[in-house]
Amino acid sequence: MERVERIVRLTWKVSSQRIEKWHWLVRRQMAWATANNEEGCWWLYPHFMAYNEWYTCSKVVIIINRDIRLIVRSYWHLQIEVGCLSTYAVSIEAVVRPPPFEKEWCTEITPEVADHLIHLHFYDCFMDSAVMKAIRGEEVLKVCRFPAGHKAQGVLSLQFLCLRVIYGPEER
């Protein structure tokens, strides 16, 4: 009997239109970063550059900081279902590279955790600098568009934070 080896990955089934939209968004992010002379934090590897990764449609590497990066792989033709030839799926992996001479490790994460990590790194989310800019009347370029990422931390609106800074802490 022939031995069959299988690799099991956590994946989320998506449509081909979502994959195309994802590729477009990544390309726009890369073009925007290039136009603003920022370091490349997002890298797109098409299927022909993802060596030895069968069924990989594309691989996107998102660098969170020096030690952590997210790898988003989109797969195609995973399982031929009845009457369906093209099946697309996405997996998200967090790779942690600790200080030198230690082995890197990786884990698969959910889209919610990936959203939270990306949001906390790429948006200043009403930190002290954003509050001070708003008080001075300067334009706050990075606007928090993902308030669900702060529900656990209890971050309030930017206007409330500005009022708290101007009038001091609430006295009881």
Swiss-Prot record:
Show the Pfam families listed in the entry.
Vif
Keywords for the protein's UniProt record, in alphabetical order: Host cell membrane, Host cytoplasm, Host membrane, Host-virus interaction, Membrane, Phosphoprotein, Ubl conjugation, Ubl conjugation pathway, Virion
Q: How does it sit in the membrane?
A: Peripheral membrane protein
Q: Which gene encodes it?
A: vif
The alphabetized list of GO BP terms reads:
viral life cycle
PTM remark: Processed in virion by the viral protease. Highly phosphorylated on serine and threonine residues.
* Summary of subunit composition and partner proteins: Homomultimer; in vitro and presumably in vivo. Interacts with viral Pr55Gag precursor and host APOBEC3G. The interaction between Vif and APOBEC3G is species-specific, which may play a role in restricting the replication of SIV to their host. Forms an E3 ligase complex by interacting with host CUL5 and elongin BC complex (ELOB and ELOC).
Position of motif HCCH motif?
119-150
Expression induction or repression: Expressed late during infection in a Rev-dependent manner.
Q: What is this protein called?
A: Virion infectivity factor
Q: Would the keyword Ubl conjugation turn up in this protein's UniProt record?
A: yes
Q: Motif BC-box-like motif located where?
A: 157-166
Can you name the source organism? Answer: Simian immunodeficiency virus (isolate GB1) (SIV-mnd)
- What else does the entry mention about this protein? Vif-defective viruses show catastrophic failure in reverse transcription due to APOBEC-induced mutations that initiate a DNA base repair pathway and compromise the structural integrity of the ssDNA. In the absence of Vif, the virion is morphologically abnormal.
Where in this protein does the record say Phosphoserine is found? 157
Query: Know anything about its domains from the record?
Result: The BC-like-box motif mediates the interaction with elongin BC complex.
Q: Which domain of life is it from?
A: Viruses
Family in the record: Belongs to the primate lentivirus group Vif protein family.
Compartment(s) of residence: Host cytoplasm; Host cell membrane; Virion
Q: What is its main location?
A: host cell
- What InterPro entries is this protein classified in? Vif
Modified residue Phosphothreonine is at which positions? 107
Q: What does this protein do?
A: Counteracts the innate antiviral activity of APOBEC3G. Forms a complex with host APOBEC3G thus preventing the entry of this lethally hypermutating enzyme into progeny virions. Functions as an adapter molecule, recruiting APOBEC3G to the ubiquitin-proteasome machinery. Targets APOBEC3G for degradation through the assembly with elongin BC complex, CUL5 and RBX1. Binds viral RNA and affects the stability of viral nucleoprotein core. May play a role in viral morphology.
- Asked if the Swiss-Prot or TrEMBL record annotates the protein with the keyword ATP-binding, the reply is no
Q: Which cellular component terms (GO) are annotated to the entry? A: host cell cytoplasm; host cell plasma membrane; membrane; virion component
